[in-house]
């Protein structure tokens, strides 16, 4: 983005401040926890709000997994000519707010304090839903774009995203794009806008260890009889050395991080590491 473009965009976005606050106030008013029977209607209201909101910025919204408790949406416009397509991601479900008495304000009433806005989901991830809407309104005000746009809005991210996983397997063509921007990460520090260019991957692996034909009594066989649970513990423990450094054959651990640095003391404070406890992987 050029300096000239930023100069054009900034006043448009700033001029939307009241609209952005209103949008965020509305969507955070829904206690849209997925998978809680007594909150099904709240989740459904949030889903309906999302669909209407993205239609209001000129995108065609298609609902998927309608027969599940957590429908997801793809709001889109086609690319013009050979223009690339951008896939944007966010989600409208939240986690439980916990004990309301521990909040400084009602978790479902957006509240401004010291220049920051507070409510359940204001950051993760309803603020990012509203951010996409504000950006799309700004694009429209600037005359539109030739880019193809797809916005994926998920309804069960906090519960593992089973509905999205199923759709990706069944309809991979829906997610075809030249670039993907996931609006569900964080900043390097408060007030420091951050672009995350890669994310940690994950894999779910089932490992089964068998050592005995049948369970036996520990009073008679304990000690000498090989314990499958103990074997699994030793297996997992072998992944790291005594300082927490990864030691798995084939995994390159010599790379140096070139992005924003995370001061160790700040990390300790943010993570709540107790005094006297080492940060994993840092000792020589």
Which sequence ranges carry the predicted segments?
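N-terminal helical capping/dimerization or prosegment-like subdomains
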Residues: 2-100
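Conserved active-site and cofactor/substrate-binding residues in soluble primary-metabolism enzymes
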Residues: 15, 19, 41, 45, ...
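Generic secondary-structure signature for well-ordered alpha-helical cores
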Residues: 18, 29, 55, 141-144, ...
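Short, internal active-site loops enriched in acidic
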Residues: 69, 155-159, 253-256
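Active-site metal-coordination/substrate-binding segment of hydrolases
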Residues: 83-150
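Active-site-proximal alpha-helical scaffold in enzymes
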Residues: 126-143, 161-169, 226-238
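Histidine/acidic-residue-rich, glycine-tolerant segments that coordinate divalent metal ions
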Residues: 146-227
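Acidic-enriched catalytic cores of C-N bond-cleaving enzymes acting on peptides and small amides
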Residues: 218-284
